[in-house]
């Protein structure tokens, strides 16, 4: 297992229902998990419990030695909006040549004139693409993706899907995008009132 929770509970003051209620969860290499549930059930909080940004109230969280987590936030907080796309990647991966960086950006649909533009002047979709590319270029083995297809057009979604299909680590994603979940996941975790119910297969299998 990359990460394991035993008897994990989490509740915020002022909320009637817990985020987790005495749950046993594990994520292993090859797992591709889609987290679904109603608004306010705590799907993003569950991602933060996996990263350790939020801490469980009781139970245990064990991260395997050598586990490295990459986290895609909806607000693109990993980006420096003053820098252009090439510089963002250069800082992350100084081992990559300019040609390799341009090829990676080209795969994520960055045209020549876009790669030199500071991110502050790019659209939400363009920022999303660079944030996703950066996470895929990191040396991680567990990817957490919070609504990764928001702001993406169909071409960009297909590019992301191809990249995630090639990715060798585990993936956990919160998404309302049924098409994306059908392409990517092999498990659905339904979060409701602190209980995680696991279904094997993709989103279409889950709703059957």
Which sequence ranges carry the predicted segments?
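ABC ATP-binding cassette signature C-motif
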Residues: 1-208
């Amino acid at each position: 297992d990359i990460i394991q929770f035993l008897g994990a509970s989490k509740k915020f003051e002022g909320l009637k229902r817990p985020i987790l209620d005495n749950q046993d969860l594990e994520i292993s290499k090859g797992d591709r998990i889609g987290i679904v549930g109603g608004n306010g059930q705590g799907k993003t909080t569950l991602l933060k419990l996996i990263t350790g940004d939020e801490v469980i109230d009781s139970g245990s969280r064990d991260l395997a030695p050598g586990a490295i987590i990459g986290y895609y936030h909806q607000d693109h907080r990993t980006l420096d909006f003053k820098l252009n796309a090439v510089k963002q990647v250069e800082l992350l991966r100084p081992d990559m040549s300019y040609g390799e960086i341009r090829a990676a950006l080209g795969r994520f649909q960055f045209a020549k004139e876009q790669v030199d533009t500071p991110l502050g002047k790019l659209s939400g979709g363009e920022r999303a693409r660079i944030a996703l590319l950066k996470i895929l270029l990191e040396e991680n083995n567990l990817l957490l993706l919070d609504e990764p297809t928001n702001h993406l057009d169909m071409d960009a979604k297909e590019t992301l899907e191809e990249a995630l299909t090639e990715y060798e680590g585990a993936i956990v994603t919160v998404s309302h995008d049924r098409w994306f979940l059908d392409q990517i996941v092999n498990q659905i975790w339904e979060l409701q009132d602190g209980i995680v119910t696991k279904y094997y297969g993709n989103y279409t299998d889950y709703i059957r």
